[in-house]
């Protein structure tokens, strides 16, 4: 019956059926599996988080699938907590971010070490105006576990002390001299400190290692603001060619 209800797009009815069945057979693997499916359809992330330990204990789904589900569950719960903080801050701009930070502390260790979960949490913090806390988190993680994904975000976030933030990132360059993502972040952090020449140098070095739309756009924008319109337009054209994968074809000379 529960299967038919799920197949018939009636997840609420299926859930009611399955909860009755679970009272009779609390550990039945098939009931647990269908419960998981019902909660997923209903996007009831909190109940799913409570169900996961039982799914793991009974080996209802493969471990790799369960780990991926757990990441998905906590990611959605973090987003819900951030939305709650956003609503609170509309009423009171000084409202704390406790719903979000408390939930972060609840995360299982392996989820809290996942670079994409860290990235999402840092983005949520920054989006709620706490860039300083986001920068501190990213700095601590990057010191011990390098991630190109996280260094990109680190370059976008303004910490409490932009000068110190740049100096810290420059220390990382000693061991990663040819990392284009780090060089892009350093260019952005140099801009934050109004070090225009240094920023351009970092962007240019990054581009030599990897032609990337994001870096082309940053260097083009900087050149435009430094009065170098021709160089800016040339870079924009290169960025468009990169975007659309244009073939290398002869062109008329200006």
Kindly label every feature range from the protein language model:
Residues 31, 65, 117, 150-151, ...:
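TPR alpha-solenoid repeat register
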Residues 2-6, 136-208:
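Alpha-helical adaptor scaffolds
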Residues 1, 35, 77-81, 120-121, ...:
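Structural register within alpha-helical repeat arrays
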Residues 8, 42, 94, 127-128, ...:
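Structural motif corresponding to the intra-repeat A-B loop/turn of tetratricopeptide repeats
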């Amino acid at each position: 019956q529960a299967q038919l209800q799920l197949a018939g797009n009636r997840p609420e009815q299926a859930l009611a059926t399955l909860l009755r069945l679970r009272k009779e057979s609390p550990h039945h693997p098939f009931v647990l599996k269908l419960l998981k499916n019902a909660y997923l359809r209903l996007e009831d992330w909190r109940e799913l988080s409570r169900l996961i330990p039982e799914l793991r204990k009974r080996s209802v789904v493969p471990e790799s699938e369960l780990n991926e589900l757990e990441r998905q569950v906590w990611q959605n719960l973090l987003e819900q907590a951030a939305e709650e903080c956003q609503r609170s801050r509309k009423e009171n701009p000084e409202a704390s971010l406790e719903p979000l930070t408390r939930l972060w502390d609840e995360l299982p260790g392996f989820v809290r070490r996942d670079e994409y979960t860290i990235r999402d949490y840092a983005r949520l913090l920054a989006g709620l105006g706490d860039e300083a806390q986001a920068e501190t988190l990213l700095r601590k993680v990057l010191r011990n576990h390098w991630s190109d994904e996280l260094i990109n975000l680190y370059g976008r976030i303004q910490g409490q002390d932009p000068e110190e933030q740049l100096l810290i990132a420059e220390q990382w360059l000693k061991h990663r001299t040819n990392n284009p993502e780090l060089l892009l972040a350093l260019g952005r952090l140099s801009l934050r400190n109004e070090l225009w020449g240094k920023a351009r140098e970092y962007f240019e070095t990054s581009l030599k290692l990897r032609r990337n739309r994001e870096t082309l756009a940053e260097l083009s924008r900087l050149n435009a603001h430094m009065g170098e319109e021709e160089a800016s337009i040339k870079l924009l054209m290169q960025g468009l060619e990169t975007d659309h994968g244009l073939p290398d074809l002869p062109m008329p000379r200006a």
